[in-house]
């Protein structure tokens, strides 16, 4: 099943637009569509907060990485400021997604 995002005013795909696509393409009502999208992203967020990786086959992996504390500097004053340790989310695209993106780019370049 193919979904079109060409009707978007901006090139970003939003949660609201995903819910609209579920409504239009699959036939869920608008409330169910919104609830399903919200639940999907809540599951991903909760899993990451708990320290678990999220692996979506054919799309990519979301991982939590702990960054060590390091010295920083205020760019205006030059004052040294310590940057505390923190956890960050990283995303690594799957080979399949990378290939799809490269395939589209190669076709655009060839035209």
Curated annotation (Swiss-Prot):
Signal sequence segment: none
A Pfam family that the UniProt record links to this protein: Bac_DNA_binding
Annotated CDD domains: IHF_A
GO cellular component term, pick one: cytosol
Annotated TM spans: none
Keywords from the named record: DNA recombination, DNA-binding, Transcription, Transcription regulation, Translation regulation
One MF term in the entry's GO annotations: structural constituent of chromatin
GO BP field: DNA recombination; positive regulation of metabolic process; regulation of DNA-templated transcription; regulation of translation
InterPro entries: Hist_DNA-bd, Histone-like_DNA-bd_CS, IHF-like_DNA-bd_dom_sf, IHF_alpha
Gene3D superfamilies reported in the protein's UniProt record: IHF-like DNA-binding proteins
Assembly mode: Heterodimer of an alpha and a beta chain.
Function: This protein is one of the two subunits of integration host factor, a specific DNA-binding protein that functions in genetic recombination as well as in transcriptional and translational control.
Family to which this protein belongs: Belongs to the bacterial histone-like protein family.
Entry protein name: Integration host factor subunit alpha
The species this protein was found in: Polaromonas sp. (strain JS666 / ATCC BAA-500)
């Amino acid at each position: 099943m193919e979904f079109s995002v060409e009707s978007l005013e901006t090139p970003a795909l939003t949660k609201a637009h995903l819910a609209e696509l579920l409504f239009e393409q699959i036939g869920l009502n608008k409330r169910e569509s919104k609830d399903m999208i919200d639940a999907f992203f809540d599951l991903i967020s909760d899993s990451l907060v708990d320290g678990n990786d999220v692996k979506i086959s054919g799309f990519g992996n979301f991982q939590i990485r702990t960054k060590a504390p390091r010295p920083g500097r205020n760019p205006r004053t030059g004052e040294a400021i310590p940057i505390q340790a923190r956890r960050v989310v990283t995303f690594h695209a799957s080979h399949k997604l990378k290939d799809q993106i490269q395939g589209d780019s190669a076709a655009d370049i060839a035209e």
